[in-house]
Swiss-Prot record:
Disulfide bonds join 4-10, 5-11. Belongs to the conotoxin T superfamily. It is found in: Secreted. The cysteine framework is V (CC-CC). The modification 6'-bromotryptophan is found at residue 3. This is Conotoxin Mo1274. Keywords: Bromination, Disulfide bond, Secreted, Toxin.
Amino acid sequence: GNWCCSARVCC
């Protein structure tokens, strides 16, 4: 699944 690496950046 996708996860957020940063406040506005999802990997």
